[in-house]
Amino acid sequence: NEAEDGAWRVISGDRCIYIKHEGESCFDVSCDSTEFESYWHRYLDLDTSYRMIRGKVDRNRDPFLYESCMDEQGIRILRQNPFETLISFIISQNRNIPIIRRSIELLSSEAGTELVDTRGVTYYSFPEPWQIAAMSGEALGRCRLGYREPYVRRTAEGVLDGSIDLAKMTCADKSASDVSEAGTIKGLCQIYGVGPKVANCMSLFGLHHLDAFPIDVWVKRILAGKYPDGYPIESYRPYNGVYQQYMFAHYRKLSKGQA
């Protein structure tokens, strides 16, 4: 959420930070250097060279992707909490962004922990699996999840009892993971209420598999309009998910006449 002074408030789990753009490559953050280096540095994925990733795109061979990369240089794939991301994408199915945001806010206020940020503003942590599993039917109903309600509860229960092991799926520490992308998607689709689209979104944004390539209505339009002969997915491994985000953001701007 954007604050009155132009700073952005970012909540991750039980943490909250304000980030304000102060100039080219200069940002002001509302935490000390110890907290930033121990948590937010990794969360913002600052050790990944997105300049290197953009540099792999040839301007002449793929002008649209090159243009997208140049126009959307600020995009990063955050290293978000896997459980929080999975629940959020389960909630997102067949909904628009304002309704998704409201349901997540309601879930957090119903089951999360009430906290206060550095500016004295109250916020709620995203609930842990045990907090969601312990919710009454009435409390969960107040979150306006609709048919997704049992998906959310059963996912929380699965993480609690170990039948859903997100740690085994993550590639956040690639040196300790040999999980293939295809295997991850298959495993995610075995979770109650998770289909291919949610699985691909979860793989990219929750497990940091940078080659995952979620396809929604906007990406379908991009592929049909800009790549009628087929998108060269093999040429862009292992960063297809990053390129998808560049194209998605740039194409949305073009469609609104903002680029």
Annotate the PLM regions.
Residues 1-259:
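HhH-family (HhH-GPD) DNA N-glycosylase catalytic core used in base-excision repair
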